[in-house]
Amino acid sequence: ADASLTIKKNHSISLMPTIDFLMKSVNLSPQDLDRIVVAEGPGSYTGLRVAVATAKTLAYTLTIDLVGVSSLAALALNSHHEGLIVPIMDARRNHVYVGFYENGRAAKADQYASLNAVLEQLKGRKQVTFVGEVTAFRQEINQTFPEAKVLEVLPSAFKIGQVGQKLTPVDVHAFVPKY
């Protein structure tokens, strides 16, 4: 089951009822779960805190695995384009959280950098697709990479869940979000 909510506030109010709705929709109980997968960030401070606290609580109380997935990886894996996929999340003050993905794998570690530094790292690349929170950066991206695809997309909880099925679980107590 999959549900998508795009809300700016009150994650703490809507998250558990949404989980409950999804579980009931597919006739599952919490005891049927064997793993909790959560976006580990980067992202909204409050949104990440709510999601991670909920995920840790569920994993701990149900004594099941917990897995964290990069929000940038989720953005990249939503894209089905050839070449380098560059997911971007606005970090304010002309800085971004950025990843570099090719063939479904991270080509570099996720970074926090100025947009100019990111564009400089990519010089010489022919086939680049920028995904994520790109609207504020579209003009600068198009000036440097006029042939690039630039797609405004959000991370998909479904994709995060898919990716998380393949990853190694983490210690529930040690897990912290990546802001």
Q: Where are each of the predicted segments found?
A:
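Acyltransferase
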Residues: 149-179
